Amino acid sequence: MPLLLYSNDNYERKEGFVMNSNLKKIIMAALFAALACVATMSIRIPTPGTGGYIHPGDAIVILAGIILGPVYGMLAGGIGSALSDLIGGYFVYVPITLVIKGLVALVSGLIYQKMCRSGKNRYVAVILGGITDIVFVAGGYFICEFFLYGSGAAASIPANIIQGVGGLIISAVLYPVLIAIPDVRQAAYETKN
């Protein structure tokens, strides 16, 4: 007999197991947070003179907003990226990263929803999410670093732009691969929050 996790109509039956769609979304958000953390920490290209690094984690943040929706995506992208800074010893950046990456996922998800509702191309929405990443990462980190380090913060702008462009390209490549997975496609196409 299948296990009923919630007693409402908002559940999905799969191979004898019943799963609430909210629980499924939470599980996917946790997976995206873990992916964002690992993608940020696994491939690091140091940026000279800044003490920072370029990484592919931004692509996961963008895709979290698109696939999970703005709210769950914001939580997954922000928490996963901030965990990477925490584990990596970049303690001062943990709250900054939480906010900036959370906003990237939030805005990417909102753009995706708006474009999908108006019948526009979903792939264009992914690219616009990548552009959002470039603006928020380069601008957001510059503003925060300006308060921390003064005018020397400008040195990080080119590296943050390169990181954002990398996030755009990687998310554009990964989107069709992920959307081909039925559960991921269903989550992305039905996303409401």
Where does each model-flagged region fall?
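Loop-helix junctions at membrane interfaces
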Residues: P2-N193
